[in-house]
Amino acid sequence: MYSIKMRSSNQDVHISGAETICEFDKIEQTVQRFYNKGFFHENGQPDFLNIKIQKIMEPIQQIKALQIIEDDKANLQHLTQECGVTEQALNQGMTYIKNETVYTGAIILSAISGKRLDSFGQRGIRATHFSFEDINNKGDLNERVTDALAIASCINAHPYVKGELCVSDDLTYTTGYFASAKIGYHRLFDIKPVNTRYGGRIIFVDDRIDLNHYISFLESTPKQVVYERV
């Protein structure tokens, strides 16, 4: 198995990213797909694109995918409150999402105080070394949803994670999500105005979390997210 990662940017501003874990015979088509995504993206033409291929030498940890909860009227305030995220923490998370900084990874906040707990600046924390497998083989989830569900499932695979809020920084995509192990994966429609680059990924955690261990899991442990529709 091989890890394939792509990152593209323009003048050091993030444009696009993608990654997966695949068999050797899928490398060529995966690289072509990531190349097309990186160079022909609505966020603009990159002046830098990097594709990294690395053989996986460690055992791959299986993670059960969160269930997708279909609810057109999902309310972010109610969802976060149900998961133990305070209004203060949510407001602080939205401040990060709406500011002008384009973060390339997630920001980790206290679910109680909203204080930022990681120290990675604009880079943030990157959930990497993962793949997604739909064991139903129905193909009813598009690539955007499978990528988001895979990341959300990895991020929430820890007992001290209360939930994750994600808003895409793509110009015309206005649907975000809130996900947690407790309540599943909820899409949030029209969470931002169209034609805006603001967005981000916020992880709300219990202050007792072993941050170094958690970050190592997200960034270094090979993971396969297995999805089964119930």
Swiss-Prot record:
GO MF term list: 6-carboxyhexanoate-CoA ligase activity; ATP binding; magnesium ion binding
Top enzyme class: ligase
This protein's UniProt keywords: ATP-binding, Biotin biosynthesis, Ligase, Magnesium, Nucleotide-binding
Pathway: Metabolic intermediate metabolism; pimeloyl-CoA biosynthesis; pimeloyl-CoA from pimelate: step 1/1
Catalysed transformations (reactions): heptanedioate + ATP + CoA = 6-carboxyhexanoyl-CoA + AMP + diphosphate
Required cofactor names: Mg(2+)
Entry EC no(s): 6.2.1.14
Record-level GO BP terms: biotin biosynthetic process
Pfam families: BioW
Family: Belongs to the BioW family.
Functional summary from the UniProt entry: Catalyzes the transformation of pimelate into pimeloyl-CoA with concomitant hydrolysis of ATP to AMP.
Assembly, per entry: Homodimer.
Protein's recorded name: 6-carboxyhexanoate--CoA ligase
Species this chain originates from: Staphylococcus aureus (strain MSSA476)
Upper classification of the organism: Bacteria, Bacillati, Bacillota, Bacilli, Bacillales
Name of the gene encoding the protein in the UniProt record: bioW
